Amino acid sequence: MTYREVLENAKKSILNCKACPECNGLGCGNTLPGPGSKAPGNGAHDNWAAWKSIRLNFDTFVEDGPTDTSCTLFGREFSLPLLSGPIGSMTQYSKEDVTVAFNDGVMEGSAAAGTIDCFGDGLAPGVLPGALESIARHHAAAIPVFNPLPNASIMRNMDMFEDSDALAVCVVVDSAGLSHWKQSDFKPGAKTVADLQLLRAHTKKPFLVKGIMTAKGARQAVEAGADGIIVSNHGGRALADVPGTAEVLPEIVDAVKGKTTIIVDGGIRHGVDMVKALAIGADAVLICRPFAVAWFGGGAEGVKTYIELLKKEFSEAMYMVGARKVRDLNPEMLRFPGSGYKR
């Protein structure tokens, strides 16, 4: 199966998404419910454009040899520094709630490709039990991502995965203001450092916090004991006119690099984007919307096809900037906006 075939197949069944060849936020705008951004709908595109504004520097004056895209995250080795992102409810893409099947397919495809899958806690009662079964079925390196519900609710959900093979657990704070959550009976809300410390203490697994967009927030997550942070503005879905994640990543790297694992999402669509993120200082990237397209377009095989495309692009870009291993990537391989040569 080719990625072109995946896109064509997805267009036949996916709703509220055009399965665009380039997932840059322009096609979906502020389509909510659906894959769009918070009105006026510029957030997803701003994320994408921020990565595109960064250029790669050629460097072939290095020792020749193959590239190694593998990495170690949370004590395990993976084929690629990539996480597939969580989608709590697939009703925004389908007339039926196919969230359990989606989670299962993405876990299967990710496990086959040697990468990590993150899945949402969802609104339906069967989502988390289904994910628990999928982790065991596919021996998946998977991370449940819990919305900012009352602490007692999060801890009950965390308990489901404590004795499982889940790689880590994650609490997302950037969804606290989503309108559909505010209108629900789940009582989501903001979290303090003390809240996160309480949740950190509740599990023996690596603990991640998603929704970091400032150096201050990154330092607070580290203070709370986070083993990893995900730099994210919820794909532009929570607040309009926020910076793109590529714009804030450098200051966050400067603040907490070496103190916690840094993962970044938002508008990352290609292997070249992955090179940019890791050269700035991220340890891995997370990609979300395209995995919905990949699953609708080919199930687990479509997911694996997309990951293999990313790996090929990532490897080729690494080679041309002079990196042979992931750890070789560094800021000197990048050209940032406004950094052009001046006499």
PLM feature segments, named:
Residues M1-G29, G217, G236-T261, R269-R343:
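Conserved active-site-proximal phosphate/metal-binding subdomains
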Residues T2-F78, G338-R343:
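An N-cap/entry alpha-helix motif that binds or orients negatively charged groups
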Residues G36-P40, A44, T99, N103, ...:
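Generic structural signal for well-ordered, non-membrane alpha-helical segments
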Residues W51-F58, G114, E162-D165, V173, ...:
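Structural signal for hydrophobic packing residues in well-ordered secondary-structure cores
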Residues P66-C71, P129, S153-D159:
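Short alpha-helical segments and helix-capping/turn motifs at coil-helix boundaries
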Residues L73-L123:
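Active-site cofactor/substrate anionic-group-binding motifs, chiefly glycine-
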Residues F102-P150:
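A gly/proline- and charged-residue-enriched helix-loop-helix capping module
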Residues E108, R137, L149-V264, G271-A294, ...:
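Alpha/beta enzyme core
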